[in-house]
Swiss-Prot record:
Catalyses which reaction(s): a 1,2-diacyl-sn-glycerol + UDP-alpha-D-glucose = a 1,2-diacyl-3-O-(beta-D-glucopyranosyl)-sn-glycerol + UDP + H(+)
Keywords assigned by UniProt, alphabetized: Carbohydrate metabolism, Glycerol metabolism, Glycosyltransferase, Lipid biosynthesis, Lipid metabolism, Magnesium, Membrane, Transferase, Transmembrane, Transmembrane helix
Protein name, UniProt field: Beta-monoglucosyldiacylglycerol synthase
GO molecular function annotation: hexosyltransferase activity; magnesium ion binding
Membrane topology of the entry: Multi-pass membrane protein
E.C. code: 2.4.1.336
Length: 468
């Protein structure tokens, strides 16, 4: 990854510490998030107003482009700028990581927040307690977030079997959700590196040996491994998620190769303790702790690396309703961080390359779907093609190219067969059709956040142990 574009004397130590952003954060309930703006610290207040302002600007701007004579020229110019950035992403050469650790291996603390996970928690605990890593150099903490099923009993029995397994039971009064659980256990851990997995994770035995060497570069604050869908063959939705995860990790690696932003994805994330402390831990005022931490790490001038191999397996949701709930949470949390940290972003605190990459991503992922509705309405009223057609075409093309490239990169270690290109093409076409749901999710989320006084309700993803 290229060096950060900020000069050396602009070190993050000379800026306001990021942990001060969270110092006044109050805690919230987990399963139903009902907190209103008045109970939030200043940085996280007024999210609805900010979202409404952005929505107004996007809608009025899109309508104006249909009414002015130079609207088409503006869109072609924007498409050109996005296209140049896209070409850079496509042709970037991924970073080659150091595979061996120089010196002694650091201590690693593995954290899992679990609530009512009786179907999967035993397998995960045994999996994590038998990783290929020197004995005494890692520990496993499972935080039982006041489960009402057999999870506490299962964990109690497993703790007798494995010395490295430690269990923290949270009370019914504990708040903060997953972020609160992770923050509560963090002072009890010893690791220089903190790993976080979901309860349905399936972890490769040599995972730590692949990830830990990446932290030898001092600016690396976190590493995200590729997420793979364990039950990918089940139906259309899980097959689509498999292709989606391939697209996501490909984009992450290509963006970081350009000096852009790597992002955390929750399951399979590894964070340097020093970086986590400097950012103030996990934010308990967000519904997507991983996406929020991504921004704070970059604002604090840390880098995030993304690793294709090995992958962490997880269950994909199997129904359209479950997918809708999950993706709405991801969309709201992802959009929310732009509203929370917009002033620091505009101050270029991340550095020019990262700020530019982030803005290109925001335009494609959030602004374009939001603008699609007024663009379509104006096209119908004025009996003309949608103004945003060129930008939309570029976005879809990048999705197709990235998905095919990601799927092919995953298959690189497999023996080539004559039918492989056709299989990849079929998976890409199916994945592209599946990805259209994001257009509806994003456009509805940005609109809903502008009008609803509450933040999104969190609906627990049920894990059944499928795909094992």
């Amino acid at each position: 990854m290229p060096a950060n574009s900020w000069p050396d004397n602009d070190s993050y130590k000379e800026l306001d510490p990021l942990n001060s952003l969270l110092s006044e954060v109050s805690t919230t309930e987990e399963s139903v998030v009902e907190t209103r703006d008045l109970s939030l610290p200043s940085r996280f207040q007024g999210r609805r107003g900010k979202a409404a302002l952005v929505l107004t600007i996007v809608w009025s701007g899109t309508i104006a482009l249909h009414l002015v004579s130079w609207g088409s020229i503006f869109i072609l110019g924007l498409t050109t700028v996005l296209g140049i950035h896209a070409l850079g992403v496509v042709f970037a050469r991924p970073r080659h990581y150091q595979k061996e650790m120089q010196g002694s291996l650091p201590f690693v603390s593995i954290l899992v927040a679990a609530k009512n996970e009786e179907a999967v928690i035993a397998k995960l605990a045994r999996n994590l307690c038998n990783l290929e890593y020197p004995n005494g150099q890692y520990e496993v903490w499972i935080i039982d977030d006041n489960s009402s099923d057999k999870t506490p009993h299962i964990l109690a029995e497993l703790a007798k079997e494995y010395d490295k397994l430690k269990v923290l039971r949270r009370s019914a009064q504990a708040t903060g959700g997953k972020s609160g659980a992770l923050n509560q256990v963090l002072p009890l851990t010893q690791g220089e590196i903190i790993a976080v997995f979901d309860a349905d994770a399936q972890v490769a035995s040599d995972m730590l040996l692949h990830v830990v060497p990446l932290f030898q570069r001092e600016k690396v604050g976190a590493v995200q491994v590729r997420k793979a869908i364990a039950n990918a063959k089940e139906n259309f939705w899980t097959k689509g998620q498999m292709a989606e995860m391939s697209l996501d990790i490909w984009f992450q690696q290509q963006r970081t190769a350009l000096g852009g932003i790597g992002e955390l994805r929750g399951n399979g994330q590894f964070v340097r303790r020093q970086a986590l402390d400097s950012c103030g831990g996990w934010n308990e005022e967000t519904i997507t702790d991983d996406l929020d931490l991504t921004f704070r790490l970059h604002l604090d001038k840390w880098d995030i690396e993304c690793l294709f191999y090995p992958a962490v397996q997880e269950e994909g949701v199997t129904t359209a309703i479950a997918l809708w709930h999950q993706r709405n949470r991801w969309a709201e949390g992802g959009y929310q961080r732009y509203l929370d940290y917009w002033d620091l972003i505009l101050k270029n605190r991340m550095g020019t390359r990262k700020t530019w990459d982030m803005l290109m991503f925001m335009l494609t992922m959030y602004i374009l779907p939001t603008a699609a509705i007024p663009d379509l309405l104006m096209a119908v009223v004025r009996h003309r093609p949608p103004m945003l057609g060129p930008v939309t075409g570029l976005s879809v093309t990048m999705s197709v190219v990235g998905m095919f490239a990601g799927l092919r990169r995953i298959r690189q270690e497999q023996k080539f067969q004559v039918h492989t290109p056709f299989v990849l093409l079929l998976q890409t076409m199916r994945g592209t059709l599946y990805m259209l749901h994001w257009l509806v999710v994003m456009s509805s989320t940005t609109a809903r956040m502008s009008f609803r006084p509450k933040r999104l309700k969190w609906v627990k993803t049920v894990h059944t142990g499928s795909g094992e």
